[in-house]
UniProtKB/Swiss-Prot annotation:
The keyword Ribonucleoprotein does not apply. Keywords: Autoinducer synthesis, Iron, Lyase, Metal-binding, Quorum sensing. This is S-ribosylhomocysteine lyase. The keyword Metal-binding applies. InterPro entries: LuxS_sf (IPR037005), Metalloenz_LuxS/M16 (IPR011249), S-ribosylhomocysteinase (IPR003815). Involved in the synthesis of autoinducer 2 (AI-2) which is secreted by bacteria and is used to communicate both the cell density and the metabolic potential of the environment. The regulation of gene expression in response to changes in cell density is called quorum sensing. Catalyzes the transformation of S-ribosylhomocysteine (RHC) to homocysteine (HC) and 4,5-dihydroxy-2,3-pentadione (DPD). Fe cation binds at H57, H61, C127. GO terms for molecular function: iron ion binding; S-ribosylhomocysteine lyase activity.
Length: 160
């Protein structure tokens, strides 16, 4: 017997969203009542742009550190295969607005304050593809995204 599965992100109409934005995908509860929230952190417009792998990889490593410095409860921040943004998985209840503020602040630091020495996990021992990083691209993308503004609504521009 095959279990019917609906993957929410494949049900989203990618032609009507307006990136950059943060969107709450789902809230789920574990067997003991623990809440996990899953966010769509969309940095570039789907099917119109994508962040090249090395820049996205560096943003990923930086967000792993910067988000945790700004908010408690981060489980993981993983890039979408389409390279337009990230899934952000959090313990507890968080609003799209709060997450958008954290992402904005993190990207501002990437754009203006980060040096190569600040990028975590860039050695053979600490990264599975340590040669595939590009801080220049990460900084350029971060600034482009900040300049557009990050919305807490995926369908209308409500920039925070």
């Amino acid at each position: 017997m095959t279990k019917e599965v609906i993957v929410e992100s494949f049900e989203l109409d990618h032609t009507i969203v307006k990136a950059p934005y943060v969107r709450l995908i789902s809230e789920e509860f574990g067997p003991k009542g623990d809440r996990i929230t899953n966010f769509d952190v969309r940095l570039v417009q789907p099917n119109q742009n994508s962040i090249e792998t090395a820049g996205l990889h560096t943003i990923e490593h930086l967000l792993a550190k910067l988000i945790r410095q700004r908010i408690d409860g981060m489980i993981d921040c993983s890039p979408f295969g389409c390279r337009t943004g990230f899934h952000l998985i959090m313990w507890g209840k968080h609003s799209s607005t709060d997450i958008a503020k954290v992402i904005k602040s993190s990207l501002e630091e990437i754009a203006t304050g980060i040096t190569w020495e600040d990028v975590p996990g860039t050695t053979l021992e600490s990264c599975g593809n340590y040669k595939d990083h590009n801080l220049f691209a990460a900084k350029e993308w971060a600034q482009l995204i900040i300049d557009q503004g990050i919305s807490d609504d995926p369908f209308s521009r409500h920039v925070i």
